[in-house]
């Protein structure tokens, strides 16, 4: 069975209730490929999660942008996986490069978070990616492999994991990895998973691309054999997010 195309929209720390309502209305009215062609998940800030979930069309789903590494308790400011499950939130994004950089989240911490979220019944979009310095030093694959290894060491079942490759140098910069550059990393990452986790997982796990994806470049990126979708930042707040969702048809044509 082929890997179903996956498009995630990461709204990051953006939006007012009026803006959020506008985006949701736009998505609800959009004509996009059916659920059997593309899986669509949007990730608003915590405060808007129930609002978006209640308003959003039934064939789209919501994700939190983070959750705590273990059971809730005396962890001021954190949100636990159990709380998300209680609210009926099916997905969570973990290990985003902004959190790795700004909040010093280590590979091991992201691995622990992923394992705990999965154990509570959440599905995980697990982010990996290299900085510009790491790319220029020729260590892209080793960096991405180390990030993935930290997850593989804690997780045995990959059914509910989507891996998002986001080169840090391409996030919000307007620079985008060329389709060939992105495909190369996706191919190498899938190969690493095959050799270190198993051929079944490598064949079925979706590896999506993030990093300045927009309506103009999404079709060409979607045409690459190892790119199974996108994690979209800035463009997920704009009408062009609909065009990115439509790029899923490249796979089914």
UniProtKB/Swiss-Prot annotation:
Keywords: Cytoplasm, Gluconeogenesis, Glycolysis, Isomerase. Belongs to the triosephosphate isomerase family. It is found in: Cytoplasm. Substrate binds at residues 10, 12. In plants, there are two types of TPIS, cytosolic and plastid. Homodimer. It comes from Coptis japonica (Japanese goldthread). Its main location: cytoplasm. CDD domains: TIM. It holds the Pfam family TIM. One of its GO terms (biological process) is glycerol catabolic process. One of its GO terms (cellular component) is cytosol. Pathway: Carbohydrate biosynthesis; gluconeogenesis; Carbohydrate degradation; glycolysis; D-glyceraldehyde 3-phosphate from glycerone phosphate: step 1/1. This is Triosephosphate isomerase, cytosolic. It catalyses: D-glyceraldehyde 3-phosphate = dihydroxyacetone phosphate. The active site is at 96 (electrophile), 166 (proton acceptor).
């Amino acid at each position: 069975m082929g890997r179903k195309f996956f498009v995630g929209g990461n709204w990051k720390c953006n939006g007012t209730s009026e803006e959020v309502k506008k985006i949701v209305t736009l998505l609800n009215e959009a004509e996009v490929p059916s659920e059997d062609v593309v899986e669509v998940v949007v990730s608003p800030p915590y405060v808007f999660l129930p609002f978006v979930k209640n308003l959003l069309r039934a064939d789209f789903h919501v994700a939190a942008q983070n959750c705590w590494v273990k059971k809730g308790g005396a962890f001021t400011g954190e949100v636990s996986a159990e709380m998300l499950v209680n609210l009926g939130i099916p997905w969570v994004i973990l290990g985003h490069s902004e959190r790795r950089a700004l909040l010093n989240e280590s590979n091991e911490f992201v691995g622990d978070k992923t394992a705990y979220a999965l154990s509570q019944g959440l599905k995980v979009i697990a982010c990996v990616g290299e900085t510009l310095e790491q790319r220029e030093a020729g260590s892209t694959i080793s960096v991405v492999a180390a990030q993935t290894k930290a997850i593989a060491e804690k997780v045995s079942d990959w059914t509910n994991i989507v891996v998002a490759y986001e080169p840090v140098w391409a996030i919000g910069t307007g620079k985008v990895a060329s389709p060939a550059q992105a495909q190369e990393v996706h191919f190498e990452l899938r190969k690493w998973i095959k050799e270190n986790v198993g051929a079944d997982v490598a064949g079925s796990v979706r590896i999506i691309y993030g990093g300045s994806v927009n309506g103009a470049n999404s079709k060409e990126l979607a045409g690459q054999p190892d790119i199974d979708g996108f994690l979209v930042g800035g463009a997920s707040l704009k009408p062009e997010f609909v065009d990115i969702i439509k790029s899923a048809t490249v796979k089914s044509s």
